[in-house]
Amino acid sequence: MISTSSILILVFLLACFMATSAQWGYGGYGRGYGGYGGYGRGMYGGYGRGMYGGYGRGMYGGWGK
C-alpha cells in the first residue's frame, strides 16, 4: 500500500509539473484549485501560502509567518 508521504510527494511533483507547463493558465495548479498548488495557495504549495508552504505564509512556512 502506498504511504501518505509518497502520495504527497507525487502530488507535489505533479503540481510542480503543472506549474511549469501551464503556469499562468491555471495559476500553477494553485490559484486555480487551491488544493495542492505548486506556486499557488494550496495546502502544500511549494511557493504559495499553503499550510506547509516552502516560501509562503503557511503555518510551517520556511520564510513566512
Swiss-Prot record:
GO CC aspect terms: extracellular region
Keyword ATP-binding: no
Keywords: Amidation, Cleavage on pair of basic residues, Neuropeptide, Repeat, Secreted, Signal
Superkingdom of source: Eukaryota
Modified residues (Tyrosine amide): Y29, Y39, Y47, Y55
PTM sites of type Tryptophan amide: W63
Signal peptide per UniProt: 1-22
Subcellular location: Secreted
Principal cellular location given in the protein's record: secreted
Any one of the GO BP annotations: neuropeptide signaling pathway
Family to which this protein belongs: Belongs to the YARP (YGGW-amide related peptide) family.
Record function comment: May have antimicrobial activity.
Listed name of the protein: Neuropeptide-like protein 28
Species this protein is from: Caenorhabditis elegans
